[in-house]
Amino acid sequence: MEKGIIITLPHHDDTTEYLSQWSFEIIEKADEKSIKVKKLEGEEANKETFEKVVKKLDYNMLIFNGHGSDKLIYGHNNNIIIEEGINENLLKDRIVYARSCESASSLGDKSTKSAEGCFIGYDQPFMFYVDSNWISNPKKDKVAELFLSSSNQIS
């Protein structure tokens, strides 16, 4: 496995737009440390593209931004990217950070059983507050910064 990051950047609603915009801090830090980053942005944040990229690049870290549930992680337009019992094996032996509601409660547990990787996520809803005056420019939202900048530190 090669040192690198694959990161999903869907932006089909306010929540995913915020997550994606604030993820560019993570990408900048990785660039500063000469860590390779493959961005799956917008429509590229889908199951088919994700599976191809993971198999081709074999990077050791995966960062998901998007909605989720206890058994699913969604990409752009809420299309399923990872589904427990279907393709969670792609997470095995990797460092996974999922900013997706409840994805750690079952999917995270299953994907790390008898594996050397880890799954960092949330077993409750992942929530953050925003200043509605900045919906069209999330990076200037000082309220969201309190939540998302600290969330970026995990990666």
Task: Give the label of every model feature segment.
Residues 60, 94, 117:
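Conserved acidic residues
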Residues 104-155:
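Active-site-proximal C-terminal subdomain of hydrolase catalytic domains
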Residues 85-104, 109-110:
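Caspase-like (clan CD) cysteine peptidase catalytic core
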Residues 1-65, 97-98:
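A domain-level signal for caspase-like cysteine endopeptidase catalytic cores
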Residues 68-92:
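A short, glycine/acidic-enriched catalytic loop
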Residues 43-46, 78-79, 100-104:
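Short beta->alpha connector loops
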Residues 64-66, 94-101, 121-123:
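Short His-Asn-centered micro-motif
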Residues 33, 92, 113-115:
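Short, structured coil segments at secondary-structure junctions
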